Amino acid sequence: MKIEEFEKIMQREDREEKQEDLEKIWDSKSEWFFKRTEKKQENFSDRLIFKIVKEKKLLNENSKVLDIGCGTGRHLLEFSKFTSYVTGTDISSRMLDYAKEKLKNVNETKFIHGNWMKNFTKEKEFDLVFASMTPAISKIEHIKRMCLISKNYCMMERFVYYRDPIREEIEKMLGRKLNKLHSNHKEYTYGLWNIVWNLGYFPEIYLDKYISETEKNVIDYMEQIICTDDEENKIIEFLKEKEKNGKIMSKEYIIKAVILWDVNIF
């Protein structure tokens, strides 16, 4: 297969948004995203990404890290435990506000707002270029740029499997499948790995499998379900029966792929 075919596999059929539209979309999601991630009952520092960084000694105290699509700064905060020289970039200024607050005690932290492809062009500027779950990496040229600005490693994290039994109960009640979540787009990882390979690098892939207990509410579920008005009423009624003191405890079954490659062959 030609490398361009893997790019098509990597891309969803979602229409491309203008930068100003994307900024508005992610600004509007920032508070929801922050609250949702902060509610997760997990020790984030135990995630496979940071175990790999530690075991492979990818970073030292002088290393420079770039997080593309850093969001509210969860990964940046963990990277700052290895090095103070962390840079976060995001298209959403409100996401960056949360990140700035989270890393206010890390002296060397930098935050760059806007289109990362326009803002980062310097060759070999960072020791590690990282991206997790971001739509900002969707083309061959994006991956090439990651390799250009890194002098050592590139690392990406993506969902390849996601299961929520409560969503499955809703499907059974409605007698149909719900809309596919972005977190189940495992084809992205397949396309990404093959693009990196075809560019001449040797990507390693690791799987991070875990069960996460997450505190949700009716709104959290409804924001991710496409349905008719009649179905909406049924789903809300069903979810309210699951609620205890306004909270729904969700058990999520998750597999994430972590792809790591060295930009230096030797």
List PLM regions with ranges.
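Conserved class I S-adenosyl-L-methionine
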Residues: M1-L59, N62-G69, M155-K177
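Class I SAM-dependent methyltransferase SAM/SAH-binding core
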Residues: T72-K118
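Conserved Class I S-adenosyl-L-methionine
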Residues: E204-F266
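A short acidic, Gly/Pro-enriched loop at the edge of an enzyme's catalytic core
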Residues: T121-L128
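Short alpha-helix
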Residues: N184-G200, E204-I205
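A short, conserved alpha-helix within the catalytic core of class I
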Residues: A136-I149
